[in-house]
Amino acid sequence: SSAHLEGFQSVEKILETKGALFNYLDNGIAYVNYADERLRSITISGEKITYGLNAECDFPADIHHDDDGSILLTIDSKEIKTKSKNLSFAKNIIAVSAVSITLGLEWDWLQERILTFKPPKGRCRILNYKSITIIDDTYNANLESCVAAIDYLMAFAGDGRKIVVLGDMLELGDASKEQHEKLGLKCSEASLDAVFTIGQEMKYTQSVIKGVPINMYYDDRGALVSYLKSELKDNDKILFKGSRGMKMENILSEVFE
């Protein structure tokens, strides 16, 4: 992913550096996501187990949806139910399944834990304040995770506005402007009702957003909090997202204190 580009300059450099870890496996097992074609050519010294969405591999997976929009997975011909509409969560389940089954655990055991899993704080955790639905995805952010979080927000059914509150995506180096502009284009395409941005880099995001009824940039956290506290309405669905250094969880907690 594009996380930590500042230290590595390119996704290819990140791949090269992280891929080097496989050289130290010796007799270990490498679990490789074959949905990412860039990973298929990595040299691995130990055993290789492959998994991936829509990929020819040891644990091939497909995604379907239940009547309520929840994700259903077919992994190596096994049906796995989830209670989530979060595509990122589903992709993690595919990886976890490959590891769990090859280590000798049973599918039924895995299914039970998937259905009872609750995301930790800051990791697409769902909170409720009166009739408002909150997605707390404040732990960290890059372009890919922001896009996934917005898609997750848009998967929620029912009345109410779809709102995002975005803080800077940090550690992107020279790619920061481009990455933040791409996020703005995603916001434009997503049929959002409101976008609130904060942070120096988010100026690039805010500047390219088109067609969103409310598109507001803030350089003052207090002003943003005050506006949200006064303007949120019943049945709103609101996503908070930003890099660790932006401490977006503080904005969330202040809005709903």
Please annotate each region the language model reported.
Residues 215-224:
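Short acidic-hydrophobic, aromatic-tinged amphipathic segments that line or gate anion-handling sites
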